[in-house]
Regions:
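Non-catalytic N-terminal regions of enzymes
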Residues: 1-90, 143-147, 152-174, 281-284, ...
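Short amphipathic alpha-helices and their capping loops
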Residues: 1-14, 82-137
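Acyl/amide activation-and-transfer machinery of modular secondary-metabolite enzymes
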Residues: 2-18, 33-35, 123-134, 190-226, ...
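Helical lid/core segments from catalytic subdomains that handle acyl or acyl-like groups
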Residues: 132, 199-281
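N-terminal topogenic module of multi-pass integral membrane proteins
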Residues: 353-400
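Hydrophobic alpha-helical transmembrane segments and adjacent interfacial helices
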Residues: 374-385, 405-409, 427-443, 461-464
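Membrane-helix interface and helix-disruption motif detector
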Residues: 380-399, 414-419, 435-454, 472-475, ...
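Alpha-helical transmembrane segments in multipass membrane proteins, preferentially the mid-helix core
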Residues: 406-408, 456-478
Length: 481
């Protein structure tokens, strides 16, 4: 009612072959599912996780343990069991809420002026499916060039990404800066062994159109930004600013539905302050005996904009672009910039099962039904006007279509929890009965006949659902009440 929460689940994870598009939804409202999934495809092991459980560091640690145990089972004769993490770590350490531990309500807050960033224009109709573009390069090559220019690899890649975006901008778009969101692992700044979310972010960017638009100019500006904003004091300020909202005594007890709407509105506004995202997962390390069986690690995230994720294993730096746009020009520009710097970039074809596509059939059925309802209302009104202009029988047709559409729409939205769906249908159909009774001249049939019969029908439906799905009293009693 007031906040989201995680609860223990008796569901057992099932490892299966990859069967849907990467980064598909794991959290489905009203449906009891695990918030992570392990699948495989050919020689690749996939670990997908919902961000509420952990961040990139926690996900990487889990994947390392998963791969280690898999390799040990396969090559038990050649491998020795090893500990990847600190043997003295406890579950309490790993479940520590480090945000709360380092939160300081008295930390001085600095007001930051909000700047609208340039937004990447869609080159046509945006894809609903996640577009993935992968490449790899030598860590030594890239690191050598970064050292020549006296910057870190993160700074070099950030500058290249900003310039790649700029090449697709018009003169009008240059009025706004290109701003990237770059997540920061706070464990490197504030000591923590937590596997829960513990990250912040910085927003390096560049204002083009001022005459100094070369790669070297951008690189110098990004280098300076990183130096100024990756300090402990600056990251603490950002962290405290965000946690203060969660800790607010009044907001804490605001209804969840109101919070969700405010969060969505805030997220929509925040989107205007960022052009794209660059996430550097840093180095993934494995014991030498195990590393010989591993080719590379890779990472990518679901996104509504363009995002670049980076991680390295041995001498291979893996780059993964994800977006829902139909253009790959930015990716092409990025690879070309790195090639011109002297880095050999190998673009790899994303390899996924052919049938691993998102399923939008239910959504399409609802869209077709919506169109049919609107068409029926329009046709009835036209017929009414032409044939019998003084009768207005089309009002009843429109009301009937609206009733059917609303009932089906709620049924579609609540389809993952049949008991909750039934409870909603009880309220909706009862309300519709009363409205129809009022609209046709109150006779009381809705209260005397309609609602009692609907209640009886819903009770029977709930009983059947509970029996078929073998639900425990804890799961269905609340709906009976």
């Amino acid at each position: 009612l007031f906040w989201h929460y995680l609860e223990k689940s008796e569901l057992r994870p099932v490892v299966r072959e990859e069967y849907k598009e990467p980064c598909s939804s794991l959290y489905v409202r009203d449906k009891k599912t695990l918030l992570f999934e392990v699948t495989y495809y050919k020689k690749r092991i996939n670990f997908e996780v919902f961000h509420a459980l952990t961040d990139g560091t926690g996900a990487t640690e889990f994947l390392r343990e998963l791969v280690k145990n898999y390799l040990y089972l396969i090559h038990e004769e050649d491998l020795e069991p090893v500990e990847l993490s600190n043997q003295y770590l406890t579950v309490k350490d790993q479940e520590d809420d480090s945000f709360s531990r380092y939160y300081d309500p008295d930390f001085p807050r600095k007001k930051k002026k909000k700047i609208r960033a340039v937004q990447i224009k869609k080159g046509g109709k945006g894809y609903e499916e996640l577009q993935i573009n992968e490449a790899s390069m030598s860590v030594k090559e890239l690191l050598g060039i970064a050292r020549e220019k006296k910057v870190s690899m993160s700074v070099l890649l950030t500058a290249a990404f900003i310039c790649a975006i700029h090449e697709e901008m018009s003169r009008m778009q240059e009025k706004k800066p290109v701003i990237l969101m770059v997540p920061v692992n706070l464990r490197k700044i504030f000591p923590s062994d937590s596997m829960l979310n513990f990250f912040g972010y910085i927003e390096p960017g560049y204002q083009f159109g001022g005459g100094k638009d070369s790669f070297e100019d951008v690189l110098e500006a990004v280098k300076l930004y990183f130096q100024e904003n990756l300090s402990k004091e600056h990251m603490a300020g950002r962290m405290n600013e965000l946690i203060a909202i969660e800790k607010h005594k009044i907001l804490k007890w605001a209804p969840l539905e109101l919070k969700n709407r405010c969060i969505r509105a805030g997220a929509k506004m925040a989107e205007q302050e960022v052009t794209a995202v660059l996430s550097n997962m840093s180095v993934v390390k494995m014991p030498e005996d195990y590393a010989q069986y591993i080719e590379k690690f890779g990472v990518y995230t679901s996104t509504n904009r363009t995002e670049l994720c980076i991680c390295s294993f041995k001498d291979t730096l893996s780059l993964s672009f994800t977006s829902r746009y139909d253009s790959t020009n930015i990716q092409r520009n990025f690879y070309r910039i790195l090639t011109e710097l002297g880095v050999q970039v190998t673009v790899t074809e994303a390899d996924f099962p052919e049938d691993a596509k998102a399923n939008y059939e239910g959504k399409k059925v609802l869209q077709i039904f919506t169109f049919c309802c609107i068409a029926a209302i329009v046709l009835s009104m036209m017929t009414d006007i032409i044939i019998s202009p003084g009768v207005h029988w089309s009002v009843y047709v429109a009301s009937g279509c609206a009733t059917m559409w609303f009932t089906m729409a709620v049924g579609y939205v609540k389809r993952f929890n049949l008991l909750k769906n039934a409870a909603w249908q009880l309220l909706i159909m009862s309300g519709i009965c009363v409205l129809w009774d009022l609209g046709t001249g109150w006779r009381g049939w809705s209260v005397n006949i309609g609602i009692p019969n609907i209640c009886l029908l819903i009770q029977i439906v709930m009983l059947i659902i509970s029996r078929i799905r073998s639900l425990s009293p804890r799961e269905y009693m609340i709906y009976y009440v």
